[in-house]
């Protein structure tokens, strides 16, 4: 949508991209016919460490299903966060600037890294974006998300998660009303392990090494 407004810039980018001798495509990529030589690789992800022992020092977190939330600026102000309190056997962790008056929603600061919180959670609730999906899958965490309008990659990510049974897209009405329980329990039954290639970094390094060696 709106591409015609930027047609001059898009044409210039297409011309520049066409000069590339190789395009490296991690998982969930969009098919294009601009660059002829392509190489698909695994996900490229940020690796974290499990910090659940630190998290469980906070009263109310121990022995609960842990859901990590990352939405950034994607309509978070429209979500009825107070309804999360109805999910009494779950806790929700986030680094986003969300309300701090919801009993089971913990807003953490930068002492906790995003990738560590993902590694320590049971499931990830996020906007469908590459970096969060790849980090979740690298730690064998299933994902729940909602639709993203005007985000061209969304359809590819939605189909990828559906085909591999590693995540699901919630109905928008349920998402914004925080009616998440059924979808969380459904997604928790998904297994990510062994379903997606995670060796993107190694493959890219090999490609670069071959190029440098000529």
Model-derived segments and spans:
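Short acidic active-site motifs
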Residues: 12, 112-113, 132, 179, ...
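Donor-nucleotide binding loops and adjacent catalytic segments primarily
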Residues: 46-123
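Nucleotide-sugar donor-binding patch of glycosyltransferase catalytic domains
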Residues: 142-187
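Short catalytic-loop micro-motif centered on adjacent basic/acidic residues
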Residues: 67-70, 144-145, 169-170, 195
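Hydrophobic/aromatic beta-strand patches that form the interior of the parallel beta-sheet core
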Residues: 22-24, 39-41, 93, 106, ...
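A donor-sugar binding/catalytic signature common to diverse glycosyltransferases
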Residues: 113-156
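A nucleotide-sugar donor-handling region in carbohydrate enzymes
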Residues: 1-76
